[in-house]
Amino acid sequence: MSLQSIKYSRGSLEILDQLLLPGQSKYLVVRGVEDGWKVINKMQVRGAPAIAIVGCLSLAVEINPEDFETKKSLRQEIEGKLNYLVSARPTAVNMKIAADELITLANDLYKDEAINVTEMKQRFLDATEAMLKKDIADNRAIGANGAKAILQRVAETGAAPAGSTGSVRVLTHCNTGSLATAGYGTALGVVRQLAELGKLEHVYCTETRPYNQGARLTAYELVHEKFPATLVLDSMVAALLRAKNVAAVVVGADRVASNGDTANKIGTYQIAVVAKHHDVPFYVAAPLTSIDLAIPGGDHIIIEERPDREMTHVGEHRIAAPGINCWNPAFDVTPASLITGIITERGVFKPAELKEAITKLLES
């Protein structure tokens, strides 16, 4: 059974505090938007899909018990609070897209004279809650599409380890599983699907400094699922790809530009460079909500910078020399030229065909 990072029923929201994993499993009650903003900003919940879901559900929890006198006051509350939630972690586009969609819904309901304020609130809550089910369904589709693409490439190139009967070894970075989504996962969903098909020989996960999402969270999920897995240091990737016959690298995304440039957890770019050198396919697994067609390339993506302490300390213990300066971007941008394919719930696309393909899908 997959881990559950988000527990929700109407009027109640709890999130698994990921800062305490793997040592302690503790759920935090999110009572409203301010709590939602804080748990996102402090990275007690993280992963672009999970950020969007928790942000929007925190608003649902807040407005559920409230009685609004007018549709205008409800619309203003929705718009103001959603825009505030976007500011918690600006690089991840999913929260912005979800906010824009829900604000558009609120405006449409506001303009519909046949709908009263009570029904307007009900429909808004229904739409927000539907995000949970949709995310899990999308993740399963991403997993299926990604596993198919990897296995097809292995069959064409003969890249599977000798004697493996078609099973593959894959590398992943950061955390993209049940803890980063409503469930199942994006890049880790691809790994999960390979395992369900009996085609996963081994998965390697990076520690993912400085926040150690790989060592703390992905390793935690892999052990929980009893997948054959090995943790490696970030600095070991080149040696790993040279020595272990890895069939593919699959990572998640916080924002994908229309040309395929991809912002993901810091360290992704260098893994892509190494994968290119070793002729290992490099895949990005992300829902359509992570693709931002409004920006032409990675240079337009805002990169969040985190506090020095995340680099200089592990818990309360300082590991860096006092007085040293730090540069701590949370993400880097992998150029589209290094990406083999972008795995979505609607198919796998080469970066060069992404904009046209997604535009057609959204119009259909």
Curated annotation (Swiss-Prot):
<keyword id="KW-0028">Amino-acid biosynthesis</keyword>
<comment type="function">
    <text>Catalyzes the interconversion of methylthioribose-1-phosphate (MTR-1-P) into methylthioribulose-1-phosphate (MTRu-1-P).</text>
</comment>
<feature type="active site" description="Proton donor">
    <location>
        <position position="254"/>
    </location>
</feature>
<feature type="site" description="Transition state stabilizer">
    <location>
        <position position="174"/>
    </location>
</feature>
<dbReference type="InterPro" id="IPR005251">
    <property type="entry name" value="IF-M1Pi"/>
</dbReference>
<dbReference type="InterPro" id="IPR042529">
    <property type="entry name" value="IF_2B-like_C"/>
</dbReference>
<keyword id="KW-0539">Nucleus</keyword>
<dbReference type="InterPro" id="IPR037171">
    <property type="entry name" value="NagB/RpiA_transferase-like"/>
</dbReference>
<dbReference type="InterPro" id="IPR000649">
    <property type="entry name" value="IF-2B-related"/>
</dbReference>
<protein>
    <recommendedName>
        <fullName>Methylthioribose-1-phosphate isomerase</fullName>
        <ecNumber>5.3.1.23</ecNumber>
    </recommendedName>
</protein>
<dbReference type="Pfam" id="PF01008">
    <property type="entry name" value="IF-2B"/>
</dbReference>
<dbReference type="InterPro" id="IPR011559">
    <property type="entry name" value="Initiation_fac_2B_a/b/d"/>
</dbReference>
<dbReference type="InterPro" id="IPR027363">
    <property type="entry name" value="M1Pi_N"/>
</dbReference>
<keyword id="KW-0963">Cytoplasm</keyword>
<dbReference type="GO" id="GO:0046523">
    <property type="term" value="F:S-methyl-5-thioribose-1-phosphate isomerase activity"/>
</dbReference>
<keyword id="KW-0413">Isomerase</keyword>
<dbReference type="GO" id="GO:0005737">
    <property type="term" value="C:cytoplasm"/>
</dbReference>
<comment type="pathway">
    <text>Amino-acid biosynthesis; L-methionine biosynthesis via salvage pathway; L-methionine from S-methyl-5-thio-alpha-D-ribose 1-phosphate: step 1/6.</text>
</comment>
<comment type="similarity">
    <text>Belongs to the eIF-2B alpha/beta/delta subunits family. MtnA subfamily.</text>
</comment>
<keyword id="KW-0486">Methionine biosynthesis</keyword>
<dbReference type="GO" id="GO:0019509">
    <property type="term" value="P:L-methionine salvage from methylthioadenosine"/>
</dbReference>
<dbReference type="GO" id="GO:0005634">
    <property type="term" value="C:nucleus"/>
</dbReference>
